[in-house]
Amino acid sequence: HFFDVYYSKGLGWYRAQFPSSIQKYYAERVQKQQFMTGEASPYYLFHPYAPKRIAKILPQVKLVVLLRNPIDRAYSHYYHEVTGGHEKLSTFEEAIECEQERIGKETEELLRNEHYVSYKHRHFSYLSRGIYVDQLKVWMDLFPREQFLILKSEDFYADPAAGLRQVLEFISVPGEGLKAQKEAYEQLNTTKPPRMNAATRKRLVEYFEPYNAQLYAYLGVNYGWDK
């Protein structure tokens, strides 16, 4: 979360989160292993300043983006916030109804003040984060297309070995020894929320349909999320 929440801590703090040069030397020279580090934060894609901060500090970075059906992403996000104690509204429907009221002014303040950290923008942006096309355009204005690997989350989790192989090839790391069985890969956050109300899902299919169409046209890929 350095490039979104903890940027004010400075580059020294960020570097301290990674293995030291001594550890790298030991891995490469003594253990004869390739050494590469990375990090992940879903909020980076949505945060208005994360792209340009990363472009400034890591202009050659390779970017792996996982995109999930925005309806399922929003629903999962809501229950994640409930479980984490951040969300107090009792239903998903109430939360998405209140979203713009909660985060609208927060977004404005973020755009006015680069150093502002918004709790609401981070935790309650259920539908807004699913408008992927607008977010990707910001990133792709700063980085060339060849620095991105964009994967469909549903495909990645259905066949993690194949997905991981794509990632390793993208970052030029050998993929020898990868296990083919899905069961070999640990899954986190496996608790499934209750089934979404059918009327709510229908409404969100209609809401996201134009944004998904723009995304498909922009990337030249149809993810089949309109259901």
Model-derived regions, located:
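Short, glycine/charged-enriched secondary-structure capping and boundary segments
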Residues: 51-54, 78-82, 164-166
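Acidic-and-aromatic substrate-binding clefts and catalytic sites of carbohydrate-active enzymes
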Residues: 3-11, 44-48, 127, 155-159
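Structural motif corresponding to alpha-helix initiation and N-cap regions
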Residues: 8-11, 48, 133, 198-201, ...
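Surface-exposed cleft-lining segments at the edges of enzyme active sites
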Residues: 41-42, 112-128, 188-200
